[in-house]
């Protein structure tokens, strides 16, 4: 959905969930915050002055490793049985991996409990890890693409790349 379609479909009763930030200025489309009276904020960063204060629910836990950990906890401990699709469980696991730098930074018991729950949901840990691996050949191709890129309007980089079947990880 593009910005216009989202704005057209929203009304005062639409539930807007803001994840991994509580700062109004970090929301990609801040105008969405004005279109609804129902906002939920899920974040693991320390509270700042630019807080989204009109939320009906704020789940902010600075001791959590990631917003993905918090979302996993919400799903895991809900009273209704939730069947989490594997791809969504893998996306949450990837979020935890990214924010913890492969479970080495800012991890706690809750982090590993969330990861264990996602594992029980059937995730393929090797597949998720491969999403973030790059070999030397891929790194060199990416370097070439970046080297040939052009900057426009001082903020946008554009590069052309001849996509080949074996290069799908670069897309």
Residue ranges, per PLM feature:
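Hydrophobic helix-and-loop "lid/oligomerization" segment in the mid-to-C-terminal part
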Residues: 1, 7-15, 93, 98-171
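N-terminal small/polar loop signature for handling phosphorylated ligands or for N-terminal nucleophile
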Residues: 1-34
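A generic local secondary-structure boundary/capping motif
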Residues: 4-7, 27-31, 58-61, 81-83, ...
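Short glycine-rich anion-binding loops that position phosphate/pyrophosphate groups of nucleotides
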Residues: 5, 21-24, 45-47, 163-165
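Solvent-exposed alpha-helices and their adjacent loops that cap or buttress functional pockets
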Residues: 8-11, 31-34, 51-52, 84-86, ...
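Generic enzyme active-site microenvironment
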Residues: 18, 41, 97
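A short helix->loop->beta-strand "cap" motif at the edges of active sites that frequently abuts
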Residues: 35-39
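Short alpha-helices
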Residues: 44-114
């Amino acid at each position: 959905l593009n910005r216009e379609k989202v704005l057209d479909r929203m009304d005062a009763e639409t539930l807007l969930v803001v994840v991994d930030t509580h700062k109004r200025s970090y929301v990609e489309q801040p105008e969405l915050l004005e279109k609804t009276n129902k906002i939920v904020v899920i974040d693991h960063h320390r509270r700042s002055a630019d807080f989204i204060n009109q939320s009906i629910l704020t789940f902010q836990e600075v001791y959590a490793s990631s917003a993905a950990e918090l979302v996993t906890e919400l799903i895991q401990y809900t009273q209704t049985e939730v069947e989490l699709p594997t791809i969504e469980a893998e996306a949450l696991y990837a979020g935890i991996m990214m924010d913890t730098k492969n479970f080495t930074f800012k991890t706690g018991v809750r982090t590993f409990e969330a990861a264990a729950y996602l594992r029980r949901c059937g995730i393929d840990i090797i597949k998720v890890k491969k999403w973030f691996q790059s070999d030397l050949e891929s790194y060199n191709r990416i370097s070439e693409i970046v080297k040939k890129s052009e900057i426009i309007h001082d903020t946008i980089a554009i590069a052309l790349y001849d996509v080949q079947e074996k290069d799908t990880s670069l897309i």
